[in-house]
Amino acid sequence: MYNAFLQRTAEAIFALGKHIQTSDRFRTAAFDDKLKCAALSPCFDPALTNRETMADSVQWRIIDHCAAVTRIYAIYEQFVHEMVREHLGLLQGILPFSQLPGAIQTSYRLGLSKILEKKDGPRYADLDLSKLVDGYGLALRGQAYSLEPRAILMQEQNLRLPELHRFMSASGIEGISAWIESHRAVRDFFQAADRLGASAEKELSELIKYRNDASHGSIDIGDILHVNVLLEFCDFILAVCEAIAERVQLAGLQALKPHGHVTERGRITESLKADTVGIGKMIGGFSKGLTVYLCGETYCLERQVVSLQLNGVDHETVRLGEGTEVGFMFDGPGKKNSIIMVIEEPSGVNAMLDAQGLEAVHA
């Protein structure tokens, strides 16, 4: 569901890490006079090492420090907003407004009132007020609707863990704080080495403190973080984003399940080949290429079925009327004891309304 978004975020974080290391190496070499050309003729522009055209070493480090902590926080905040947008888009494309989680319905109503209150400001100047109000009326009347994400995406502070928890809860995504702290990627991060903070909450608070200081210009030589700490923040935010993506994914599945749009097909009881092969008793239809979700109390993995076997025989497609043992090969590691969940082909809100004989009116 969100693997592509996570991959794009990972690429942005990797790019930042490369920049941090490259800038550090180049600065060190430039000021240690280690940038030499082995050829008889110059192999690079001598201006690159001209002290008159370079910031001094301390100012260079301050600039790199500020750029790094500002960028890594921006990547994190953007990812959170992106996940909430996608979560809302998934649900509104399938469920009538009345079937959305109560937290979303309440947050949307309150968010609309804040937009109306601040409509004359620049932040919401592009919104058509009449369409916004009419669209909400359609949603309340059980007709086809489209949510304005900005009514939900209202954060009161920087996204420290308590604020992230509040922000996600308002979007119908509960328990994000405990989920992040217990997620395997975050646990692996803290187990790998001594960290600036002793928990995800403290590590995130440290990052935001440095980011805010950088934004306000209150940085001196004693505040500059070593390149290894900047890279630590990169690794940390990548782990946090992985945890968030899985929690949002699971929240979407759980919201759709009571209405029949997601079904549990069985449990993986045996894992082989570095967990890429899973075996368990299943029910329903499966095919090669099918996207499935392997879910547990602290994870929700999106995987594609690469191959499947029934009684040791490969099949392109199987349809099981009762619990039958099936072997899967996935495109990535799974987990033993995970529950396999599948999103059923959605009819969408418009089709549901048509089936009910209701008029589907678009905002």
Each predicted region: which residue ranges?
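Non-transmembrane, amphipathic alpha-helical segments
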Residues: 1-4, 8, 57-72, 192-199, ...
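Charged alpha-helical initiation segments
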Residues: 1-67, 82-87, 94-95, 100
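Amphipathic, Lys/Arg-enriched alpha-helical patches that create a basic surface
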Residues: 5, 12, 16, 163-213, ...
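Charged/polar positions within long, soluble alpha-helices
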Residues: 21, 77-88, 212-220, 242-253
